[in-house]
């Protein structure tokens, strides 16, 4: 994104041209085959929603924007690099990386609230898929959301969230 290597969370910054290209390349291979998606869901933050809007128009698929799919809110750490945070609050940053369920950045969203919000979003997606007879949808969201879903899918504690890889701009 335009803010580069910082904690962006709720910060609503746009993708860079490189980020936009990563997103396009991620779906390009899928577009070589008949598209299996019946709808596209996206976070409301522009780094996801702008690409989702263009893709939904291109594929003529419904687009459902859901604010519950937003990244975790990092509070006072929003827009700061981990180096900046480490210089100011080394103990808190280290504790947060090691056990995020126990340590919350100042004025940030606690991990249990983030988890509840994301689970609520995916329950709604599942409900709408059943109601519309959709078998497959594309969800365009953020690294933290993907990491949390990987934790939940593999029955790992949410404290493993920050140790799980999530490649950006990938399917």
Label each region the model flagged:
Residues 1-61:
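Active-site-proximal alpha-helix that buttresses catalytic centers in soluble enzyme cores
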Residues 54, 148-152:
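Active-site signature of alpha/beta-hydrolase-fold catalytic machinery across serine-
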Residues 59-119:
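Phosphate-handling substructures
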Residues 32-36, 125-136:
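Glycine-rich phosphate-binding loop signature in dinucleotide/nucleotide-binding domains
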């Amino acid at each position: 994104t335009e803010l580069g290597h910082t904690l962006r969370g709720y910060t609503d910054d746009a993708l860079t041209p490189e980020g936009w290209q990563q997103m396009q390349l991620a779906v390009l291979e899928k577009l070589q085959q008949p598209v299996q998606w019946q709808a596209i869901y996206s976070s409301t933050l522009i780094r996801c929603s702008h690409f989702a809007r263009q893709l939904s128009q291109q594929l003529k698929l419904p687009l459902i924007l859901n604010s519950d799919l937003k990244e975790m809110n990092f509070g006072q750490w929003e827009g700061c690099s981990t180096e900046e945070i480490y210089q100011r609050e080394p103990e808190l940053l280290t504790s947060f990386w090691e056990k995020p369920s126990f340590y919350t950045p100042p004025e940030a969203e606690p991990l249990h609230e983030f988890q509840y919000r994301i689970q609520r979003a995916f329950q709604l997606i599942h409900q709408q898929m059943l109601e519309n007879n959709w078998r497959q949808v594309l969800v365009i969201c953020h690294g933290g959301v993907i990491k949390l879903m990987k934790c939940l899918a593999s029955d790992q504690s949410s404290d493993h969230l920050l140790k799980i890889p999530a490649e950006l701009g990938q399917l």
